[in-house]
Amino acid sequence: MTQPIIPRVGIASDAHQVEPGKPCWMAGLLFEDADGCEGHSDGDVVSHVIVDALLSASGLGDLGSFVGVGRKEYDGVSGERLITECRQLLAENGFTIGNVAAQMIGNRPKMGPRREEAERRLTELVGAPVSVSATTTDKMGFTGRGEGVAALATAVVWKAGA
């Protein structure tokens, strides 16, 4: 009798402060009508939270241990590169990605009109289905005041023979 493959689930959250004048990268897309988020990278909160959820599900650490804050080679790094390198790390460790669900929390950028485009791009990068949703906090808290953007993600992975 063969061993069943048991899925592993990871969750993650991330938040960044809005930085006026910085290009807005979110969910792998450039939003030219919104300010971006501060950070040592491109500030793509959705891409970051996807990486964090994948690392959580696989037990391979978190975004901080994966890229670190003080590593110069990751200054300004794109969310696309982070996802690509994370996907490679999971594959090297025998993991297959099942799917990812990510939710952006904030007033801007407006994800609704580009949600399907974001899902296509992230699905391509992750190599598995990615669903994207967005919500606001009805003017409450730092995201409601437009001071920042947050995101949540859940990822499902499995390891053959585990």
From Swiss-Prot:
4-CDP-2-C-methyl-D-erythritol 2-phosphate binds at D14, A15, H16, H40, S41, D62, L63, G64, T135, T136, T137, D138, F142, R145. The record marks H40, T136 as: Transition state stabilizer. Binds 1 divalent metal cation per subunit. It is an enzyme of class 4 (lyase). It catalyses: 4-CDP-2-C-methyl-D-erythritol 2-phosphate = 2-C-methyl-D-erythritol 2,4-cyclic diphosphate + CMP. Keywords: Isoprene biosynthesis, Lyase, Metal-binding. GO terms for molecular function: 2-C-methyl-D-erythritol 2,4-cyclodiphosphate synthase activity; metal ion binding. It comes from the Bacteria. Pathway: Isoprenoid biosynthesis; isopentenyl diphosphate biosynthesis via DXP pathway; isopentenyl diphosphate from 1-deoxy-D-xylulose 5-phosphate: step 4/6. A divalent metal cation binds at D14, H16, H48. Its cofactor is a divalent metal cation. Its EC number is 4.6.1.12. Homotrimer. PANTHER family: 2-C-METHYL-D-ERYTHRITOL 2,4-CYCLODIPHOSPHATE SYNTHASE, CHLOROPLASTIC. Belongs to the IspF family. This is 2-C-methyl-D-erythritol 2,4-cyclodiphosphate synthase. It comes from Corynebacterium urealyticum (strain ATCC 43042 / DSM 7109). The gene is ispF.
